[in-house]
Structure formats: structure tokens, C-alpha cells
Amino acid sequence: MLRGRSNNESVPYLRLMKYPGAKFSIIPVIEEIFRASECDTFVDAFGGSGSVLLNIPSKIPVYNDINSDLVTVFSAIKHHTFEFKSALTRKVFDILNSSGKEVNPKRGPVSKRDVNAIEKAVNYVVSFSTSFGGMGRTYSTGKEKAYKAYLKRTLEIYDKISKNISSWTIHNMDFRELIPKFDKTGTFFFFDPPYPGKTWYDYDFMETDFADLAKHIKTLKGKYLLTLNSEDETLFDIFGNPTFIRSYENENGKKRPDSKKYRYKAFYTNVKR
């Protein structure tokens, strides 16, 4: 994953862990709209893996997710930077030295063996990064080398990641509480709600949730960008016609012959471009 620079060089995107629905392909669009908004505050309402805030600079970055496990991860990195790195290093080295045995159990409720929030956070990051497709619900074996290289890369860029996260304000709120708290002139909201019908997330969105989000968006004082899969046409009845649609090469399509070559993202915004 590469990001552009003004001198036409490219550098890798910062990425803490594998996670479903990461936004690397649309980060250039998000950054374009955010810059055009001229806002100081960037609120990622459905922050997930943090891929957006990690790669789009803002004066006041705000991370939010309703998943308390994700919030624990970023809070641990922000407030216990070196302790988290030490625990992650030990965990990764244990995995790198494993010899073909299962190294990561299926993700579920945090075990009682996790004696503190740092261990819980490290185990959560590792469980996603060593699972198939970043889904966190299956496990990898020592025969698979890709996730080991991924974890090594995570350690290599950890200092850059933690420095970025140190400036974040981190919240664990429902979007209905979050929006009124931060809505004002100068605030930019990025909304990327869970995809309908997917089982990737611990907290799925119902049609009533989308309807509530649409109501909040209509009364925003600040600026926003909302992204949806354009194939979810039922959502068009809720949000109306998108401001624009973009096509992206389907990475999964390269591996599965039955997949579509391109996927289409619908974007909604009140930012003039």
C-alpha cells in the first residue's frame, strides 16, 4: 500500500494490523475532501483499525469506535507506548520462533490469562494480524509465512505509528453521542459505517442505524464525508443519490475467479470541491 507525496515519491501507508474494511484504496479521496473542507478537527466516527487517521494528517485527530477492544488497543499505545512495544515484541518473537504449530487461537472473549489492558491489546492486534484475511475469527499455522513478515513489519514501523497515535483523542461512543459532542464549524466527520450483511464486525449496522445516521448528517454544522458500497442500493433510499461514485480494482478479485474485477464506492459530502 503506497501513498503519494508532493515530490512524486511514494511511501508505504502506516498500518498497525490487518482488519476488514481498511480504507487504503480511498485514502487519497478522503484526504482530498478533508483538505478542501479547511477544517482543523478530523473525527473518524467508525475508526476501526485506525488506517485513516494514521495516514491523513490533521491538527486535531479524533478516533472513535464502538468496539471497546479496538479502543483498548489505541489507548494502550497512546498511554503505555513503551510497555505495549515490549509486550508486542515478546509476542512477535514467540511467533517467529514457532515451528509449524498453531500460534493464534480463534478470537473470542478475552481470556482470564490476560492480566492487564496491555496484554489484551497486544493479543487483539496479533489475533487479527495472524488470521486469514484479517477477520480475526480463524487462525493461521506456522506453515504460513506471510503473517510473520507482516508482524515483523509492524514492529519496524511501531515508533512511527505510536508517535502518530500520541496526538489522538480517543473515544468509545455510539455515533449518536459522538456527533453532538464534536459537531461545530471547523469539524470534519468521516463516516464509514459497517457494511450491511457482512459478518466481519462485532457491531453490525441495522437499517434503523443507517436512518439515524442520515438524520444526524442532515443537521450537521460541520463538514462530512460518508462512504458506502454503491451495490447497497437500498441505502440510496435512506441517503439519496451520492455526490460521486468511484471505481476501484477489487484486490480479492485477483485471488477469486468468481469475484468482480472492480468495486464501486459511493461518496456523500457537503464539501465544495
Where are these regions (language model features)?
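Short active-site oxyanion
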Residues: 38-42, 59-60, 165-169, 219-224
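Short His-Asn-centered micro-motif
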Residues: 45-46, 64-65, 171-173, 191-193, ...
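Short, solvent-exposed loop/turn segments at secondary-structure boundaries
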Residues: 201-205
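Short loop/helix-cap segments at secondary-structure boundaries that form the rim of catalytic
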Residues: 53-58, 180-184, 233-241
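SAM cofactor-binding core of SAM-dependent methyltransferases
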Residues: 32, 40-105
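SAM-dependent nucleic-acid methyltransferase catalytic core
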Residues: 2-17, 21-26, 32-36, 80-190, ...
